[in-house]
Amino acid sequence: VVLDPRETPPSHPKRVYRQLVQSLRYPDIRRRGEPGLKPLFQRAVADEEVCERFDVRRGKGDRDERLAEGMHLYLSPALSYFRELDADDAAERVGDIDGPVDGYLEEAEQLLFDWIEGHPTISNTDLNDKLSNIQGAYPWLYSLMDFRPWARIYGYLLSGLSTLAKACGYSGLAVFVDEAERFSLLSSENRDFARYVFKALSYAAVGNQGVPFPRSQLADLGGWGVQKELPPRYGDDPGLYAVYAMTPHEEGIDTLYDCVPAGKISDLRPFDDRDFAELASKVCDFYASAHPDWEMSEKTVTRVTSLVEDVRNKGHVRSPREAMKFIVELLDVARHYPDRIGEVVRGIEHLTVY
């Protein structure tokens, strides 16, 4: 997720969470677009052990007892409903409604994912009413508000998703937060809330023993009733991996040291020739895997690496980002216009020193 003071301000945990879900990528799914949580949910409800682990079933039962036994306050009810909506005989599980059943099922599923993925949607009360046409009793769907103090609740939700991913056979969930230095563009009040978001994500990833602050700092943040009692982390080993990328900035660095163990903060050194050569090789490898119908020769990789060194020496490429852009554009020409690549390469070779 790329933090932005307007679209994805780090002071608003729901917006950060929503962007994370929208940016979600699965190692075994290569289709374009934003798959969201549906592929993970489909995998979960198809596995009885996962359903048992998350207490996915009909019936409300005693909420506190179910939470103690492993139920996730948000994911377990969502999975319980989705299992009914995704079933082959889903139409037979719908009570009397006005209008076509297929339309109801499609709308109900969309509303369910809008809610659990953090999109603007109807209230959780209206959503519970909407889903009440599905036969059986289900746990209550609680609110997911766009309130700044809710960092702990979204940390609980993210660690739950990571635990679910592990249960489904993945290694967990990796969260990459880019442009973290934009935190400094916020008002002083919003910077305080952004610190809670960073702390909640760090706590959800490594737990009480791995963070430089006490759990009590997250205890009273957001929610009502049972939401107030939710821990900042679901499970003992959720497999959540969090990375913050920040251009050095005095206040931002101080904030990182408040949220992340000092031993986990690394200063990246500038790229040297060997690093740029490795970057060229890796970008070529990723490009080839993304376009399996196009054959990339070892000669092409060697030539691209040489051209990157050439344009760097002439001052036309200065950063890893510029190098990646140059490599991808060069490979695009080679793939789409193979008859013109020679002309392009000759033009690059004749560039003057910048």
Outline where the language-model segments fall.
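The catalytic "switch" region of P-loop NTPases
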Residues: 114-303
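Trafficking entry modules
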Residues: 114, 342-354
